[in-house]
């Protein structure tokens, strides 16, 4: 997952790509021929990642590119700009309606199972042999569950493997535990939070923090819970999510972290070992390694900053974090064409597919290897990274996908998670009591969402 484009840049792209066609919308989709005589496919995304993949598909399939071209709209999720614009485009329909559109984990259920699910085409309607291809590619069940609509049809799949691992510093592991072996470290930090905090205590004795901030454990807590925030249109606080209050307070009271907030400067500083105290690890998928920790480690080769001083092991509890699902418009007149693109990105497990190229670092010039949705592809690929001291990360991320749970999400997660984490921080900072924080959280949900709160 790459950093999002800024809102201004994204809106600039939006204007650039859509200004060329000022024709009015019709009520139904129709074939869209450009001045070149090619059929136009409308692509909607919140970063340039998926549009770049489609460009690659066009490059590798010149016969396809002779017939089709893309009109791309990119709007960053910053300040919640993407969803309203996408919703309006889907509802308006017509020749400017999205043919392919993207949704990330924080709001994907709205488009696969929630209010906007009515717009999504089933993958089978795109000419994809869904059941057999999912099985052949060994797609993790959580990804399938999230992309399945209430009728049981798959309408979205991801291309990333976003099952989570514990990503830790080898030098600190050796100093405190006498080993940096992932097979041994996973037994030290887990399974379960009790062992994790035992490890935190040993790290603290030597002046280290186990994580940078409480946000580092949040995604493990959130995605390992049994229930989502909303059940039968009623707010539910799963006991495992409520326990986040206690886990966060334990981190704070025992000085087990640097009390940072994720995606802020102090959090990034801990990745290069320049925080108030050195931090042992972070929780995350492969994208956190490639696109967040590596760029902020203070170096570009072994010996610089913390580059090469990292490893991954199974986390104390299984979870996933993030991911992008590809969907198609059920009213598109170009289902066969968009089905070919989506299949190549999400399910093709041959050496000619996106998944294989991405897993093996041959997709682009950067040579970045990433964990992909297909377990089959990762099994046949080499995930060794110098950044991880030569470790093959796929040995950890393949099973990590199987531990993830995709049945505890709701279409309101992006909003409710923010309310919850804000109140947890107010509790751990002493601004509110535990009860006051929970009550304020419930009030925020009641005031802003059309759900029942007791």
Task: Label every PLM stretch briefly.
Residues 42-45, 73-75, 99-103, 156-159, ...:
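Structural recognition of the beta-strand scaffold that forms the well-ordered cores
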Residues 124, 131-134, 144-217, 229-262, ...:
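Helix-loop-helix "hinge/cap" segment bordering the ligand-binding cleft or interdomain interface
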Residues 51-59, 108-110, 217, 223-224, ...:
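Extracytoplasmic/periplasmic substrate-binding proteins
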Residues 66-68, 91-94, 299-369, 422, ...:
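Extracytoplasmic/periplasmic substrate-recognition and gating elements
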Residues 83-97, 113-114, 173, 197-202, ...:
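Short helices/loops that flank or line small-molecule/ion binding pockets
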Residues 102-165, 303-314:
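Hinge/lid segment of periplasmic solute-binding proteins
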Residues 356-426, 454:
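Long, aromatic- and glycine/proline-rich binding clefts that accommodate carbohydrate-like moieties
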Residues 5-11, 15-116, 132, 349, ...:
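Conserved N-terminal structural module of periplasmic/extracytoplasmic solute-binding proteins
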């Amino acid at each position: 997952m790459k950093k999002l484009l800024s809102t201004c840049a994204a809106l600039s792209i939006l204007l650039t790509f859509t200004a060329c066609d000022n024709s009015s919308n019709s009520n139904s989709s129709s074939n869209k021929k450009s001045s070149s005589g090619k059929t136009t496919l409308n692509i909607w995304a919140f970063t340039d990642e998926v549009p770049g993949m489609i460009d690659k598909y066009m490059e590798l399939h010149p016969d396809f590119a002779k017939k089709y071209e893309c009109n791309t709209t990119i709007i960053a999720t910053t300040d919640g700009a993407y969803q309203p614009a996408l919703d309006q485009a889907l509802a308006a329909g017509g020749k400017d309606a999205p043919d392919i559109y993207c949704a990330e984990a924080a709001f994907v259920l709205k488009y696969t199972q929630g209010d906007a699910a009515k717009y999504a085409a089933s993958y089978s309607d795109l000419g994809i042999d869904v059941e057999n291809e999912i099985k052949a590619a060994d797609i993790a069940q959580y990804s399938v569950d999230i992309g399945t609509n209430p009728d049981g049809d798959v309408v979205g799949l991801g291309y990333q493997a976003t099952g989570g691992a514990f990503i830790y510093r080898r030098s600190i592991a050796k100093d405190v535990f006498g080993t940096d072996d992932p097979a041994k470290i996973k037994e030290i930090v887990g399974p379960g939070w009790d062992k994790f905090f035992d490890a935190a205590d040993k790290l603290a004795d030597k002046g280290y923090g186990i994580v940078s901030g409480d946000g580092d454990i949040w995604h493990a807590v959130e995605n390992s819970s049994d229930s989502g925030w909303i059940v039968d249109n009623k707010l539910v606080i799963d006991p495992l999510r409520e326990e986040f209050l206690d886990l966060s307070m334990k981190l704070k009271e025992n000085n087990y972290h640097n009390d940072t907030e994720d995606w802020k400067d102090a959090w990034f500083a801990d990745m290069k070992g320049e925080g108030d105290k050195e931090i042992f690890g972070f929780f995350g998928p492969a994208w956190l390694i490639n696109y967040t920790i590596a760029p902020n480690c203070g170096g570009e080769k072994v010996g610089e900053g913390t580059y090469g001083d990292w490893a991954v092991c199974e986390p104390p509890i299984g979870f996933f974090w993030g991911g992008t699902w590809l969907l198609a418009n059920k009213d598109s007149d170009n289902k066969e064409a968009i089905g070919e693109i989506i299949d190549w990105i999400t399910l093709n497990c041959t050496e000619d597919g996106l998944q294989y190229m991405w897993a093996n670092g041959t997709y682009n010039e950067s040579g970045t290897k990433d964990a992909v949705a297909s377990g089959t592809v990762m099994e046949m690929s080499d995930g060794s990274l110098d950044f991880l001291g030569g470790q093959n990360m796929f040995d950890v991320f393949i099973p990590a996908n199987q531990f993830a749970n995709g049945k505890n999400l709701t279409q309101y997660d992006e909003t409710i998670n923010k309310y919850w984490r804000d109140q947890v921080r107010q509790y751990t900072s002493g601004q509110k009591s535990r009860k006051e924080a929970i009550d304020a959280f419930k009030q925020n949900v009641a005031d802003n969402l059309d759900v029942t709160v007791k």
